[in-house]
Amino acid sequence: MWFFESSISITESGVLQGMTDCHSHLLPSVDDGVKTEKDTFVILDEMERQGVRKVWLTPHIMEDIPNETVMLQQKFQNLRQEYRGKVELSLAAEYMLDVLFEKRLQQDDLLPLEEDKRYLLVETSYFNPPMDLLSTLKRIQSKGYYPLLAHPERYEYMQMKDYKHLKEDRISFQLNVPSLTGMYGKHVQKKAEILLKAGMYDYIGNDTHSVDFYLRLLQCNIRKKVAINLANRNRGFD
């Protein structure tokens, strides 16, 4: 069985070496992520030791956490001025596909990941799809953005046919590395491995919310075959 195969810790595997982390909650005191600047710097120092090259700070924006773009930009500038490490920092946001998002999209009041294209990191409920998901994603595209679906392996309502349909519609996928370690459960782990093997992921992230979470991730095991696949794919994620 797949879960009896040899494994290695995330730290020992070296899969984070050279990584661009496209999903994190390291901007302090703006959502359910890191609460203090000190904790942010502890995580960034450890990321630097692991060889992480760049981190996108992607705070939540949703009806329950209605962060304002200007406020996030100001907090990010303050953080970057205080940071003395070598990891490159950039600001974007993770958007829940809800009523607030529709308003922000209409106003073009958004924080995209500006890599080679303007990607919008978006998420849905883990259990229930939003109404007209595909229509919403197509509206994002019509505005000149590229939808980047956060941690698709975690959506219980999605099956392989759903992932294939989304890829056919040019929707990009972002892998949560913790999914490959079983931190979210074996079912999510298996889905993540299948999607990775199928080459469906476009970007990766750790979705770090706290010091404890990140340190635990580093000690978690990943199957060696999966680690090799991730390391090889990681070269194409940047």
Question: Language-model segments: which ranges?
Answer:
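Mid-to-C-terminal alpha-helical segments outside catalytic/metal-binding sites
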Residues: 4, 9, 218-238
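Non-catalytic positions within long, well-ordered alpha-helices that form the structural scaffold/packing
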Residues: 48, 141, 196-197
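Short acidic/histidine-rich active-site segments
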Residues: 201-216
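Extended substrate/RNA-proximal surfaces in nucleic-acid metabolism proteins
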Residues: 66-170
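An N-terminally biased module of ancient metal coordination in phosphate/nucleic-acid-related enzymes
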Residues: 1-87
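Active-site beta-loop-alpha junctions enriched in small/polar residues
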Residues: 25-27, 60-61, 92-98, 125-127, ...
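Acidic-and-aromatic substrate-binding clefts and catalytic sites of carbohydrate-active enzymes
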Residues: 34-36, 64, 128-129, 155-158, ...
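Hydrophobic faces of well-ordered beta-strands that scaffold small-molecule active sites
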Residues: 20-24, 55-57, 89-93, 120-122, ...
